[in-house]
Amino acid sequence: MKPDIHPEYRETTVICSCGNTFTTRSTAKSGVIHAEVCSNCHPFYTGKQKILDVGGRVQKFEKRFGQLTGAARVARSTGKPRAGRK
């Protein structure tokens, strides 16, 4: 390996927007990383389902395609349920 080509790996404080802070190691020069979501507030870890919608993408999709899935839309339009896959 070549000497002196790797960045310094130092102790870094991570600060989440929810207020949680923890220490890890990183190559960040400032020694501080600001995060929007951490394991304290992320829906996967907390069990709370909330949609992190950026720019109204979910509403735009629902407006364009409706809230029904493809199979439900076919069943609704024909009046009979659609057979599932095996």
Curated annotation (Swiss-Prot):
Cofactor detail note: Binds 1 zinc ion per subunit.
Gene Ontology biological process terms from the UniProt entry: translation
Keywords: Metal-binding, Ribonucleoprotein, Ribosomal protein, RNA-binding, rRNA-binding, Zinc
Gene3D superfamilies tied to this protein: Ribosomal protein L31 (4.10.830.30)
MF GO annotations: metal ion binding; rRNA binding; structural constituent of ribosome
Annotated residues for binding of Zn(2+): 16, 18, 38, 41
Entry-linked Pfam families: Ribosomal_L31
A cellular component annotation (GO) from this entry: ribosome
Cofactor(s) the protein requires to work: Zn(2+)
NCBIfam families linked: L31, PRK00019.1, PRK00528.1
UniProt-listed PANTHER family: 50S RIBOSOMAL PROTEIN L31, CHLOROPLASTIC, LARGE RIBOSOMAL SUBUNIT PROTEIN BL31C
Functional description taken from the UniProt entry: Binds the 23S rRNA.
Similarity remark: Belongs to the bacterial ribosomal protein bL31 family. Type A subfamily.
HAMAP family according to UniProt: Ribosomal_bL31_1
Record note on quaternary structure: Part of the 50S ribosomal subunit.
Name recorded for this polypeptide: Large ribosomal subunit protein bL31
Organism taxonomic ancestry: Bacteria, Bacillati, Actinomycetota, Actinomycetes, Acidothermales
Gene: rpmE
